[in-house]
Amino acid sequence: MAGLELLSDQGYRVDGRRAGELRKIQARMGVFAQADGSAYIEQGNTKALAVVYGPHEIRGSRARALPDRALVNCQYSSATFSTGERKRRPHGDRKSCEMGLQLRQTFEAAILTQLHPRSQIDIYVQVLQADGGTYAACVNAATLAVLDAGIPMRDFVCACSAGFVDGTALADLSHVEEAAGGPQLALALLPASGQIALLEMDARLHEDHLEQVLEAAARASRDVHTVLDRVVRQHVQEASVLLGD
């Protein structure tokens, strides 16, 4: 990536966006009738699909059941054609396991699990195309799928990435910006309360700049919430029309 100018003197990024500007987001809910909830999202060229089953009885050993809340199970996978590498990734490889764990931690903080003790909620997310902000796209798709399943949440959980280039915080990083190797973080936020569901950081960043990058990610996550809220309202309206309400 040597020699590539990530931020021009005029304040424009490689893809023409301003520093705090999101890539275009398009999303749909209810894309799979067989699942309790489902959603598809595009954030720029990153595309993710999420399906949700539950709450249902614990599968396997009953000893896994939690007496005071639901067990949240999250599994992540990426299609072999999702990146330019065309590399076959075995199910359950390290990256997939780490992403599944991050998603579980995120949604345990957002779902009102205490309303469904001794039950299980399964969230499956697959990335169909990866072009930066993979974790964020997975969270945002899963949020819509959980809502589509009618599972109560404390709030939407909305996610976005951010990085730091030439003294400027950049929101919603593309693959080119991520590959440049600068400091970057991923944030999952409950926008109404401002509670952080998950924060992960790659590479070192001086504490003087951390607040700036964190605020860029939080602001972008709130912008994501505006989009997702509109998607949910549109879905509810379309469902009401189909039901004749």
Swiss-Prot record:
The modification N-acetylalanine is found at residue 2. One of its GO terms (molecular function) is exonuclease activity. This is Exosome complex component RRP41. It comes from the Eukaryota. Pfam families: RNase_PH, RNase_PH_C. GO terms for biological process: defense response to virus; DNA deamination; histone mRNA catabolic process; maturation of 5.8S rRNA; nuclear mRNA surveillance; poly(A)-dependent snoRNA 3'-end processing; positive regulation of cell growth; rRNA catabolic process. Transmembrane segments: none annotated. CDD domains: RNase_PH_RRP41. It is found in: Cytoplasm; Nucleus, Nucleolus; Nucleus; Nucleus, Nucleoplasm. Component of the RNA exosome core complex (Exo-9), composed of EXOSC1, EXOSC2, EXOSC3, EXOSC4, EXOSC5, EXOSC6, EXOSC7, EXOSC8 and EXOSC9; within the complex interacts with EXOSC2, EXOSC7 and EXOSC9. The catalytically inactive RNA exosome core complex (Exo-9) associates with the catalytic subunit EXOSC10/RRP6. Exo-9 may associate with DIS3 to form the nucleolar exosome complex, or DIS3L to form the cytoplasmic exosome complex. GO terms for cellular component: cytoplasmic exosome (RNase complex); cytosol; euchromatin; exosome (RNase complex); nuclear exosome (RNase complex); nucleolus; nucleoplasm. Its main location: cytoplasm. Coiled coil: none annotated. The keyword RNA-binding applies. SUPFAM superfamilies: Ribonuclease PH domain 2-like, Ribosomal protein S5 domain 2-like. It comes from Bos taurus. Keywords: Acetylation, Cytoplasm, Exonuclease, Exosome, Hydrolase, Nuclease, Nucleus, RNA-binding, rRNA processing. The keyword rRNA processing applies. Non-catalytic component of the RNA exosome complex which has 3'->5' exoribonuclease activity and participates in a multitude of cellular RNA processing and degradation events. In the nucleus, the RNA exosome complex is involved in proper maturation of stable RNA species such as rRNA, snRNA and snoRNA, in the elimination of RNA processing by-products and non-coding 'pervasive' transcripts, such as antisense RNA species and promoter-upstream transcripts (PROMPTs), and of mRNAs with processing defects, thereby limiting or excluding their export to the cytoplasm. Belongs to the RNase PH family.
